[in-house]
Amino acid sequence: MYQKISVLIIEDEKSICDFIGKTLDSHEYKVTVANNGKDGLALITSSLPDLVLLDLGLPDMDGMDIIRKTREWSSLPIIVISARTQEKEKVQALDAGADDYITKPFGTFELLARIRTAIRHNNK
């Protein structure tokens, strides 16, 4: 039996959550959403998703803290989705343990390709 790949979206902007959620749902991913960092961290530990899509600019905490805390115990793929476009910020996120970094705005095909790549690399 085929099991859907589970993706946790940690993003506070509803329109972006809806866009990503509908895109992933239509491509047979199981989607869970958290609108803040606290809920996101709780869902990472309780639901153990196959992949996390993470915004850095959350209302209650910086996404960098979520990366660091998750990396203390897990190697699950984390793809940052952020409006932060400075090279320094991208490098910091990748060095903290993010597997990839996509800047907003982004296209559907790029997002799906990066998810497939992260899952493929994690399964090796």
PLM regions and their residue ranges:
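N-terminal/domain-start alpha-helical segments
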Residues: 1-123
